[in-house]
Amino acid sequence: MSQNLNWDEIIKKEARGIENYDLGEVHAVESDTVVTKKGVLDKDKFYLPKSFVEAFDGHNLRFRITKEEAQKYRRD
């Protein structure tokens, strides 16, 4: 999936994991990483590998990652 995606289109879109886990909003796209921010005051940032992208429906970017797995990619 990741090769066919126009990465510019996903900025400011919602990011979701397995079981609709909220990964926040896409903030940036780097060479092999998608950066998301979640929260209002205390923002968690997730640095997720592009290879985990499963689908994009125009509104939500879906990742093949569970809530527990996502914590490995979380930074403050």
Segments (PLM) and residue ranges:
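Peripheral interaction segments used for macromolecular assembly
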Residues: M1-D76
